[in-house]
Amino acid sequence: MAHELTVQELEKFSADFNKNPKNKVVARAAQRSGVLEASYNDRVQSELTRVFSTELDTDNVTNQKHSGRCWLFATLNVLRHEFGKKYKAKDFTFSQAYNFFWDKIERANMFYNRILDSADMPLDSRQVKTDLDFAGTDGGQFQMAAALVEKYGVVPSYAMPETFNTNDTTGFATALGDKLKKDALVLRKLKQEGKDDEIKKTREKFLSEVYQMTAIAVGEPPKKFDLEYRDDDKKYHLEKDLTPLEFLHKYLGGVDFDDYVVLTNAPDHEYDKLYGLPAEDNVSGSIRIKLLNVPMEYLTAASIAQLKDGEAVWFGNDVLRQMDRKTGYLDTNLYKLDDLFGVDLKMSKADRLKTGVGEVSHAMTLVGVDEDNGEVRQWKVENSWGDKSGAKGYYVMNNEWFNDYVYEVVVHKKYLTDKQKELAEGPITDLPAWDSLA
């Protein structure tokens, strides 16, 4: 039912506000320093520590800078922990630019696939509009990184260093997005006119142009490189003329992405069900995005078990909530906004997802956990925002934040129950691109 605000109502609102003298004190603090600073809970500093009962041997952090490549950084961070542990080279890093290059090409190909598949839909249909809205962007999921690594391998960071356009993807993403949207109109018209032969030639031309744009912005990937590093014992290692796939299979052959499952906690969806996100798959004919939705305690138990076995855990989360970038605190009580405004802002995890308040905005890596008599107190988190953020790039997260704002963890299937193992291999319920899990 429509309601029109009246002068009398507005005068009453003002009178109610001014009735309480504390409101003016709070208002001055908020207006001078911002609502987050004014509501900052100093007690968090004494409640979160940097000591963990289980902790991996960590190294220097990476820095995604002004890009949406957290999903790729977190995946390569998990792999570099494995490499560092196996070969005693904890400061060794993989090139994010290398896999980013191939993601641009593969994702463009998938975009053209979707545009052709939806050519009979109106241009303003939700499906087509969503595909167009995300053209050229660089956010992603764990399986997207896994698909790229499986198909193209990995290279050391020195073999394909970062460039201006990988550190700040804004300009390139805009240019690529514009091109893809322009191409979409051409491909839709050809499909609607039934010109299949012309579609094949045109798509190939468009993909060649995407390759050209990406090579100009990022640089062409190396076909071979020399593996050269000094391990933690200062011993020198050199192996010449490795291809990226040879490097992957020889040095990380024990990592099989098929052995890993993404457990998700989405209370707005049915539990014990395997969901897919086909609109986000980035490599045609490769690893699909699959999420097994289970109660939160299973994400906790599997993550702890994997950490205790010495393996890092990729996790998807909403880092934009209750986070202090400077200190690296992730705590549900960090900003007391309810107290500042005098209103109840609390929502359940399910309601946050339903309304778009909650989202998977970031991916990081779990590298430690602190338990006290079986109760989880806090987690150690490796971020990819450089060493000027948090404690030399590492964050500390209380368990309430984990429960409220973590939505996905990637764990080996050996940590699943028998029922969950069956579900992970079972039928997939595909979700649309606008679903809360997308």
Curated annotation (Swiss-Prot):
One cellular component term from this protein's GO annotations in UniProt: cytoplasm
What domain of life does the native source organism fall in? Bacteria
State if Oxidoreductase is listed as a keyword. no
Task: Please name the catalytic residues of this protein.
Answer: 70, 362, 383
pH dependence remark: Optimum pH is 4.5.
List the GO biological process terms: homocysteine catabolic process; proteolysis; response to toxic substance
Q: Which InterPro entries match?
A: Papain-like_cys_pep_sf, Pept_cys_AS, Pept_his_AS, Peptidase_C1B
Pfam families cross-referenced by the UniProt entry? Peptidase_C1_2 (PF03051)
According to the UniProt record, what class of enzyme is this?
Answer: hydrolase
Recorded hits in SUPFAM superfamilies, A to Z, give: Cysteine proteinases
Query: Which keywords are on file for this protein?
Result: Aminopeptidase, Cytoplasm, Hydrolase, Protease, Thiol protease
Is Phosphoprotein found in the keyword set? Answer: no
Q: How does activity depend on temperature?
A: Optimum temperature is 32-37 degrees Celsius.
Which subcellular locations apply to this protein?
A: Cytoplasm
| An annotated Gene Ontology molecular function | cysteine-type aminopeptidase activity
Q: What is its EC number?
A: 3.4.22.-
Q: Which PANTHER family does the annotation name?
A: BLEOMYCIN HYDROLASE (PTHR10363:SF2)
Give the similarity note.
Answer: Belongs to the peptidase C1 family.
> What is the official name of this protein in its record?
Aminopeptidase E
Its taxonomic placement starts with:
Bacteria, Bacillati, Bacillota, Bacilli, Lactobacillales
